[in-house]
């Protein structure tokens, strides 16, 4: 039987999942996105050439891999067409390698308009969304009024359904948010112009994956964002609108939950966060600037500067718990090169003086938290591009070992640079 491996983020996203998925897909036959939308930004660097993917799975660059967008993904037709066009211009036959679930909810212009209108109305209390309509599209899905890829098979019925939902959302946009209405005809004309392209890629994803599993094929599930942004388990309300955890794999793809064999958690060697929300280890000093500059911490999707801080082992332990992680991939270790001292948060001191070694459950519980740090010597020798475990500086090895001790999870892969080749695989998830 084949192995099914999940790759997901253990922090607030931007951990380096895309590179790891691309690397491991050398052995996989299928790569599946199961949640999120084009709010993701997965950066791949292969032989020095950079590719940023937002919606299409990171396996698309591999000839032997079928990439699948599962039902848990909210799909923006315009974003998909743009991404397909960019890849096809480079000679990548996307339409031969990409398949879609007919149950994917569609993100349409009124979702984007609502997203931006709401963020503007929130003012200082804005969530910090990407403004791409992700949340409103999931709202429509749950409210059972959303349009899906399957609706594109009947264009006459689609036109009627679209008119109803455009009128519904325009009422709110115009009368409550005092912004312009979305143009129904322009939306309809565009979607119908590309409908046949999308429907040609539709398959029964659950059936396909079950057949692949029975044949012994290797399947990889690619998560987007990170565990601490999960709609249920994250720092609510400063979260995304989907289940970013391992539990989302089954519901977002149609694979049976017993058929997940290994869950790889991507953990950055320090912490970052985009947008508002709790971040106990955030640094506002020159070390924070150092991490931002050395790590090039600017969003692949929005270009926004990421907030930076020390590694939070308490938060990562929560990810271990929720996702039943099998192993870690430690990324961006090289960014810490040159620091005289590195720190890991091992607990929180609450405003009343109590110490905690677990994360609060509600956003209010994070207020006033002070991180309790454990300090370790840094290293001056470079780890950038190192491909042998034994050649890492001893202080870096000690740092890795301490992460394993604090979380109870082995580091199976170490990334020492952005390129596919700058990686050490100590234990292959497909063989674990």
Curated annotation (Swiss-Prot):
InterPro entries xref list: Adenylosuccin_syn_GTP-bd, Adenylosuccin_syn_Lys_AS, Adenylosuccinate_synth_dom1, Adenylosuccinate_synth_dom2, Adenylosuccinate_synth_dom3, Adenylosuccinate_synthetase, P-loop_NTPase
Family matches, as Pfam families: Adenylsucc_synt
Residues the entry annotates as binding Mg(2+): 14, 41
Positions with a binding annotation for IMP: 14-17, 39-42, 130, 144, 225, 240, 304
Residues annotated as catalytic: 14 (proton acceptor), 42 (proton donor)
One annotated GO molecular function: magnesium ion binding
UniProtKB keywords: Cytoplasm, GTP-binding, Ligase, Magnesium, Metal-binding, Nucleotide-binding, Purine biosynthesis
UniProt subunit comment: Homodimer.
Alphabetical list of NCBIfam families matching this protein: PRK01117.1, purA
Similarity section: Belongs to the adenylosuccinate synthetase family.
Protein name per Swiss-Prot or TrEMBL: Adenylosuccinate synthetase
Underlying gene: purA
